[in-house]
């Protein structure tokens, strides 16, 4: 089971970040529109979840299911267990989830540009009606801070909590229905 350690960097200049990553020698991954549906039991209580389950579809027809454990906040980053695997037929899995008593409670769409550099993964995410942000995944909080300095982002605002809280608390938008 993999652990992710990540932080979100807010208030970024998207073109400047892309340029800096390419100058460092980062590998750019093709851009995608992601469509994400979240599932849980009907009696879920927001903020009390012990795990999260989603089906994510990429614009290139790749689909995956992800189970995530509740995150631990590590200063400016967060850590959580995560299991991902590819699925060929997301509609059938969605039907299966509903048959075993789960319900779809949220839907998002976002555009993503990703890069890989050494041991880091970078995702520039753009949701509708809000500024883009950069998510950095690394081996530790210090590892993430190291690359923030390389990118000259160490003075930017960071966010360690989940995207739902970011979207609802900072941008006052409905995370449950983020559609283009």
Predicted regions: what they are:
Residues 1-122, 154-180:
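N-terminal strand-loop-strand beta-hairpin
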Residues 16, 143-146:
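Short amphipathic alpha-helical segments with coiled-coil-like heptad repeat character
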Residues 125-129:
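A contiguous pocket-lining binding segment that forms or flanks enzyme active sites
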Residues 131-133:
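Proline-centric
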Residues 145-156:
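Long, well-ordered alpha-helical scaffolding segments within enzyme catalytic domains
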């Amino acid at each position: 089971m993999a652990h992710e350690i990540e932080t979100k960097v807010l208030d970024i200049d998207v073109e400047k970040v892309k340029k800096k990553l390419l100058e460092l020698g980062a590998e750019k991954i093709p851009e995608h529109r992601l469509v994400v549906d979240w599932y849980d039991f009907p009696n879920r209580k927001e903020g009390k979840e012990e795990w999260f389950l989603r089906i994510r579809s990429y614009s290139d027809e790749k689909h995956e299911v992800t189970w995530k454990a509740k995150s631990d906040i590590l200063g400016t980053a967060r850590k959580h267990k995560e299991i991902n695997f590819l699925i060929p037929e997301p509609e059938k899995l969605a039907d299966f989830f509903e048959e075993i008593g789960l319900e779809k409670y949220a839907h998002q769409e976002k555009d993503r540009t990703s890069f890989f550099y050494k041991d880091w993964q970078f995702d520039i995410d753009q949701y509708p009606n809000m500024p883009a942000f950069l998510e950095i995944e690394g081996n530790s909080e210090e590892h993430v801070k190291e690359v923030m300095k390389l990118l000259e982002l160490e003075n930017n605002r960071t966010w360690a909590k989940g995207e739902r809280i970011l979207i609802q608390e900072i941008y006052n938008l409905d995370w449950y229905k983020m559609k283009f």
